[in-house]
Amino acid sequence: WAIGFNADGTAFIARNGLSVSVSFGGQAVKLGGGINKVRKLTDSAAVGGLTLLTDDFAATTQNTEPGVDVILSPVDDGTGTYAVKPTIGRQTQYVVEQVLESTGSIPIPEGKAVLTLNAKESEEALARLRALQPGDTVTLTVSSSDQRWSQAVQALGGVSKLVTNGQVDSGLDASRTAWPAIGIKADGTVIFYAMDGKQPGYSVGATQGQVAQRLIELGCVEAICMDGGGSTTIGVTYPDQEGMQVVNKPSDGSQRKNSTAIFLTTGLQPTGELASYYVTPSDSILLSGATVQLSATGLDTSYFPTSGGGVSWSVSSGGGTVDENGLFTAGAESGFAQVTATDGSASGTGYITTVRTPDEITLTNEATGAAVASLNLDPGGQVDLKASASYRKLALTAQDTCF
C-alpha cells in the first residue's frame, strides 16, 4: 500500500500495482531488483536481480560484490516523448555509455543511471548485459494497474491499510508501539497523525487497530499506516521561530535518520501585511490557579512574522482571567479557555486547558531535585520543597501558590 499526492493537493491510498521492465537487444526483461533499491541476488520469488540505480539513489551504487554495471545516459529529444527520469505511465530511453566489470561499488554519474547485476546471477542474464555496446538503446517502461499513479506527483509507501470506506481493516498488527499514519476524510482533507509509544510511564503506544479507530473518530474514511517505532516523528517550524522542531516524543530520545518522510512546504513569500496574531503558548495545561505568560506575534498574509501593534487580551470562552499584559490565570474549575489577542483589526487565539484535580502531586528537594516522601529535620532546620502536579502523565504548569 502507498499514499499518492496529486498536483492539486488531493490524495489517494492504493496498491501501486507497478510493473517495471527494460528493453534492449530486441527483448524485454523484468527489472526484478526494482529502481533505486540495494542490489540483491534473485530469490525464489524472482525478486532481486537486475536493478536500475539513478543518481537519486546515492553517489555510488553501494554494491559490495562483483557484477556487471552498465552506465546509461537518458535521452531528451525535446519533444516530451520520453521522460528523463523513471516515471509511472511513461518510458525513459537511455543510451549506453559504458559496460563495466566491477569488483564492487562504482560512482553513479550525475544525471545518469546504472543498470547493475550481481556476478553470481545466471550466465544467460549476465551475457545479455555484457552484450550491450556503447551507443545501444535501453528503454525503461514503468506502468501501473491503477492509472491514478500516473497522475501522482509525490508518493510514499506504507506498511498497512488501516481504514477502508470508514471501517477498520482486518489483520492489523496488535503490538503496541509508536505509529505514524495518514488519513483522508470524505471531503478530501488529509490528516497526518502520530502516536508516541515504547515509553512506559509516558506512552506505551497503540495497536494499529486503535490508531485506525482514532482516525475514524477524526472523520477519516481511508487511512494508511507508515513504518512505526522509533522513527515516528512530527516536526514543525513555528511562525515565531527558526528551523524545524520535533513536537512529539520519539522513543529513541531524539529525531533519528529516516529514509522516507513527507515535507509540507510553501511557495508563499513574505508580504509584510499584518493579517493575524500567533498566540503562544497555544496549548498549555495548567493546574487551577496557575499562571502563564502569553505573547502575540504578528503574522502577515503569508503567515510570516511581521510587526504588529499593541494588543488587548480577553478570555472569550472557558474559565480564567487574563490581564492587559497577557498574563493568564487559570480558573477554579476544569475546562478549556479560549484566549484572544486583538489590535482591533487583526487577532489571534490560544487555547488553554485547566485541571482542577491532578492525578498526582510529587515533592522534590529544590536544591537536589531528589524526590521527597518524608522529612527529618533538626529543630529550626529548613528545606526548600518544590511541588509538581500531573494529569494523565502530562506535567501541569503550576506555581507554589497552587498547592
Regions found by a protein language model. Give the residues of each.
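Gly/Ser/Thr/Pro-rich low-complexity, intrinsically disordered segments
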Residues: 1-402
